[in-house]
Amino acid sequence: MEGGRDLIYISSDLHLNHDKPFIYTARGYSSVEEMNKDLITKFNNTVTDEDEVYILGDLCLGGADSLIDNFKMLSQLNGNIHIILGNHDTETRRKMYEALPQVVSISYAETIHYRKYHFYLSHYPTLTANLDDDKPLRARTINLCGHSHVTDPFADWGKGCIYHCEVDAHNGFPISLDTIIEDMKRRVQEDEARYAKQLAALKKCFDEPFTKVNTIIQIQPIANCDKCISTPGYDCPGVQNPFYDRCPEGHKYQRDPPDGGYYS
């Protein structure tokens, strides 16, 4: 409980009983048994039985002979569990999930509205995430996902409003929606500061030449071209635009700036 209310947690890709070194060694474990035990401990040290938990797929692996062992491990998990199916969640495993007493729902995707924020939960990263970066965070659709086993929750941030919830990205722990919101607000603020700095640098690059061009235009208007100036009473249209190489009549004209000046 925090502030007198139950929390909502998100996790993904536990891969319990996935007896492949590229999974458990990448997470810093010496064996799949060590990984299983540690992930369950971290889960239950974070989540209470009163909390809601969304697991975004790939809870466990292993052959048919591992079903009973997987059922026993998953039965230990705290919370009211909502499962979003992943690519390793076969029909056989889905039936096993349905038999777990703490599982509340099983689906392929879910939408959550929380603290005026809008979340789309899926196993895979999805372009459902709103790409309007200029909108406030509360006006965007935030995609919470897993699948990729990245260690950076913002690994797909440049593709949209996407936040990774794999245990790989959170040191094995489930993460609360409140923490996700604060994490994303911090990232948005960092992006805005970085964009402002880049814009200031870009503006500085252009300010000097633009100022010089404006000064040149003010102190030395472009003269009429040779042909137009020789026609009495005719004002060459080229005088109005110093960036033309030729006047609208097609006549080339002289546009040398003062010493030290230049046109862009």
Task: Describe each model-derived feature in a short phrase.
Residues 1-6:
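Short, Lys/Arg-enriched N-terminal segments with co-localized hydrophobic residues
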Residues 10-12, 54-58, 82-87, 121-122, ...:
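Active-site neighborhood of phospho(di)ester-bond hydrolases with catalytic His/Asp-centered motifs
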Residues 11, 16-110, 206:
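Core catalytic region of metal-dependent phosphoesterases/phosphodiesterases
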Residues 45, 134-136, 220:
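Structural motif
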Residues 99-194:
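Conserved beta-sheet core of the metallophosphoesterase superfamily
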Residues 202-264:
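Cysteine-centered metal-binding/redox modules
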